[in-house]
Amino acid sequence: EDEFVLSFHDINPQKKIHALIIPKGRYIDLDDFSQNASVNEIVGLIKGINIVAKKLGISADEGKGYRALSNISDHGGQEVPQLHFHLFGGEKVGKMVS
């Protein structure tokens, strides 16, 4: 947790490492966030994703890598009306869309 984001492990992990990263502002999805968040909030979220990846040992710097995913609206599979990113890693994550 920092000034801009809150992060925690998913209670129903889909991969070996599965964390959620949530901006502290109230934003419905990435569209809402990109249109209404401050520059500091946007930078804070992007940097927050990288910080969490490093803390979990899955950043590209460690030669591993990860997938950051955010579902947007009905066709994108969004179930919770709060912007959040899923961070998957610790193993190969497979194809982009099944």
Where are these regions (language model features)?
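HIT superfamily nucleotide-processing domains
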Residues: E1-S98
